[in-house]
């Protein structure tokens, strides 16, 4: 490996050029490399990396595979899961197709999720990102304001995605962003107002470009933009935006529209509350969203409408027990770490579900109900070594009674039982 020429000049160990022929030589243990070879190596690595991260249609799970994965974590909402699986599959297929030279360029289809509180909107979006192994970010629309006003700029949503992709911009450009509480940025009235609505219509206007696809300038540290600041450039054309909201009150708009169409002789008269919210949401039209307060341009950039139903008692009981990370399984694991067995009887599960329905909190309220009821016993267990089993009954939920507790005889503790088990295992081995 030549380091010197005959004139005792340093040479690049890779290309053989002398120090006079290059701008810079960098020394290593027994070797030298010039700036030109460094640039060449960087290009080769960048090209290879681009090939490895490039999306291939074959690597994107098929709609039925995506739905199967969603089924493992999300109970019910069959129609919504199918719609989302197809929409996500088509989105990533579109990314791959648009890279090729084709006559037809496929446009982006963002998704709007509508459903009552606690119906699983956020969980669906999070689970989609897991199955696809893409960066994911959640943003709260209520914190966003128009540029120049107190609050977060819309570009800060993109920063969260970049951070979750470990500042790999290229990977972030294929990610998913979930914007929650999107119904809270509806303008205050259907008719345009002369006063500025900086957290409603103003935010909708600010979101239009990034939803459609643009090269946005994002401050690396977040916050407001200011002159002489460096920006991260990110293209949002291939980012999938999923917007979600409860849209309280939109059911009345749908009901009024559907009522008008069934007036006259022979029309079937329905009671005022005959249809539930879930069924009404299935009949939603873009015009209903305009009446609710979303501007036409914003609705146009969310062409896929996916509605979720209110969860009934059976669905809530299944949510407590069936998913991979079901709440009952989580609490059993927590107790198991203290060598205590936890059991919920069927009546207790039914009572928890009924309480969640009464509170109108959906699946989100299940944890709060369990936590309220179990705080006292979880406080006692670590310091009471004689407790071995806890049973949650219907009375614990309805009458606020203490859970049933099984204890060891005097003089015995969970610690001594555990050490005896270890000794037996060692002896048998």
UniProtKB/Swiss-Prot annotation:
All copies of domain ClpX-type ZB, residue ranges: 1-53
An example Gene Ontology molecular-function term: ATP-dependent protein folding chaperone
Assembly information from the UniProt record: Component of the ClpX-ClpP complex. Forms a hexameric ring that, in the presence of ATP, binds to fourteen ClpP subunits assembled into a disk-like structure with a central cavity, resembling the structure of eukaryotic proteasomes.
Keyword list, A-Z: ATP-binding, Chaperone, Metal-binding, Nucleotide-binding, Zinc
Chain's role: ATP-dependent specificity component of the Clp protease. It directs the protease to specific substrates. Can perform chaperone functions in the absence of ClpP.
Chain residue ranges for the region called Disordered: 401-429
NCBIfam families: clpX, PRK05342.1
Record: residues binding Zn(2+): 12, 15, 34, 37
A cellular component term, taken from the record's GO annotations: HslUV protease complex
One record GO biological process: proteolysis involved in protein catabolic process
Family designation: Belongs to the ClpX chaperone family.
Provenance organism: Clostridium botulinum (strain Eklund 17B / Type B)
Binding-site positions, ATP: 116-123
Start-end of Basic and acidic residues biased regions: 401-413
InterPro entries: AAA+_ATPase (IPR003593), ATP-dep_Clp_protease_ClpX (IPR050052), ATPase_AAA_core (IPR003959), Clp_ATPase_C (IPR019489), Clp_protease_ATP-bd_su_ClpX (IPR004487), ClpX_bact (IPR046425), P-loop_NTPase (IPR027417), Znf_CppX_C4 (IPR010603)
Protein name (database record): ATP-dependent Clp protease ATP-binding subunit ClpX
